[in-house]
Amino acid sequence: MSFNLGKSLTKLIIASNNDGKIEEFIQLLSGIPLVVMGQPKHLEVEETGVSFAENARIKAIAVAKATGEMALADDSGLSVGSLGGAPGVFSARYANTDLERVSRLLKELEMVDDRSAFFSAALCLASSKGEVLLELDGRCDGIITTTPRGKFGFGYDPIFEVKGTGLTFSEMDSKQKRELSHRGLAVKKLIPSLKKILDS
């Protein structure tokens, strides 16, 4: 992306080692004059919070302090009503791989009629000094399908059918997913405030 502003662009570090998530943020923030990149590969931040918002805050502050750059963290996950909100904050740790996580969830819902679920995303933006600048969230409702569908996306995307669309995230192109996803909705709220911060 190239913006000729007569000055160097601000870096924004995405507090994640998940390549799929980083790429999604690069696309979501493509209209803003920023250099968006993932955190250093060696950097690991332990998610010790009990909520998405708390984990996002922990990650944003840690990555900002470690890199000396502005950092944006997202903690997101899938909550299934009939499983008491699981996997919730443990979505990424529900099993070792995306395939295993999807398989485990489908197995747990084998005999369950109520398959309603929602994705939540909590965002936290921290300054280069590690101060919290913004905290926002987004939510997308849907149901868990009985089998994986589609070839795009990552994580639970193949088994999450977005309410009112008849499509899983994995069946959507990236533009449609950006418009409807929990992360896309949260970033939409973030952008006006982020622009003000960059202009100040």
Swiss-Prot record:
InterPro entries: dITP/XTP_pyrophosphatase, ITPase-like_fam, RdgB/HAM1. It is an enzyme of class 3 (hydrolase). It comes from Prochlorococcus marinus (strain SARG / CCMP1375 / SS120). The active site is at D75. Keywords: Hydrolase, Magnesium, Metal-binding, Nucleotide metabolism, Nucleotide-binding. Binds 1 Mg(2+) ion per subunit. Pyrophosphatase that catalyzes the hydrolysis of nucleoside triphosphates to their monophosphate derivatives, with a high preference for the non-canonical purine nucleotides XTP (xanthosine triphosphate), dITP (deoxyinosine triphosphate) and ITP. Seems to function as a house-cleaning enzyme that removes non-canonical purine nucleotides from the nucleotide pool, thus preventing their incorporation into DNA/RNA and avoiding chromosomal lesions. Belongs to the HAM1 NTPase family. This is dITP/XTP pyrophosphatase. Its cofactor is Mg(2+). Substrate binds at S16, N17, N18, D19, G20, K21, S76, F154, G155, Y156, D157, K177, H182, R183. One of its GO terms (molecular function) is metal ion binding. GO terms for cellular component: cytosol. Mg(2+) binds at E46, D75. It comes from the Bacteria. GO terms for biological process: nucleotide metabolic process; purine nucleoside triphosphate catabolic process. Homodimer. Its EC number is 3.6.1.66. It catalyses: XTP + H2O = XMP + diphosphate + H(+); dITP + H2O = dIMP + diphosphate + H(+); ITP + H2O = IMP + diphosphate + H(+).
